[in-house]
Amino acid sequence: METPGLPGPSEAAAAQRKVLLVSSFVLPHAGGVEQFVDTAKELLRARACRVRILACRLPGGSGDADALLPSWFVPPGGWPLPVGGWRTLWREIGEADVIIANGARHLLPALAVLVARLRRKRVLFVLHGSGAPFTKSSFFYHRLLGSVFEWLVARPALRLSMPVSLSRAGVAGARARYGVEATYLPYPLRELPRPKRARSLVANEPLEIVWVGRLYPEKDPLSAVAVVEQVRRSRDARLEFYGEGILADALERLARDRPWVSVRGSRSWAQIQKVQGAAHLCLSTSSRDATQIGILEPLSRGIPVVSTRVGDAPRHYVVPGLRMFCVEPGDIDAAAATILVLTAAYDRHRDEFAANGRLLKARHRRGRAYLAALVEPPPPPHRRSTSIRPGDRLVLGNQPTHVP
């Protein structure tokens, strides 16, 4: 029997599916949402799809994409604005079978949706956000212009495509913020390296903490400094930041008077895995987030993580005894106290995180099959199957479907 939404033997033998991933960025910031593009590319190519990437041309002319559009980057945050390359956009979309538009807050993915509809192509629109408001961002850029962009650009584009959310929080957020129903796709984790050894913590050993992500207000890296500063009142600790963004200079200024703070800049995905695997724990201080890939990957590897309770973060702590390590955003005292609880019985909690990682990895492994299913052509409507588990949510045609 064949499963609706999943490729069958006859479909697997068919010609390669041509998938075009459209994203303003490919890998601009360590830990940024754009990491999905590279992940999706590798997973779909492993499933015999022919994948191309269309992106904005970065300053300097480089970019890890097959086709690039000339673009301006609007200060202060570098919002990408394509200013040319329309023939390239038209050609790339015309040659693809399926378009995956990545990110609802940028113009290029929305333009790709409009062109794809003109060219009668199937479009999947990947949502990364949780729908939570921007409480720490510029009033003019994020709250005023952002709202105008959502109403005039993002909402129409989402209604012309099939929205796909990489987080449970994003499903509810898409309904509340954009008025659309999104299909939930468990984040398709790539193969994660195992930590080389189980890290222990000696009584007088400095606690090594790693923070990975975009250095922007909504990620709140400045709070991480305050948290570790409070931890240091009880034991020695060091904090390393990996990422890029508009708060890099502010962190550098803080680091001048705090030799235990290091701002390392951006690194490759493989390098980040090594850094996280060598640390005692990873820290996330986001005030708004969705998938929380910056903690999902280390948690899936069994690495201890202290995080804020935003987006899907609470769901990543599968083992009940670990949920105390997920605290309210902005609560410096709670985060510091939780880190000290972790260090007081580090070996025991480390083993619990290892068990949690196995459960979390199994949960997100199915995201690979779901991603492949999304780009396959829908099966004929008369096909039926009894092999789908209750609660699965797959795709038929251009609309999500709930499987009873």
Predicted features by range, described:
Residues 104, 287:
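Aromatic "clamp/platform" in nucleotide-sugar-dependent glycosyltransferases that forms part
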Residues 249-270:
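Nucleotide-activated donor-binding/catalytic signature segment of Leloir-type glycosyltransferases, i.e.
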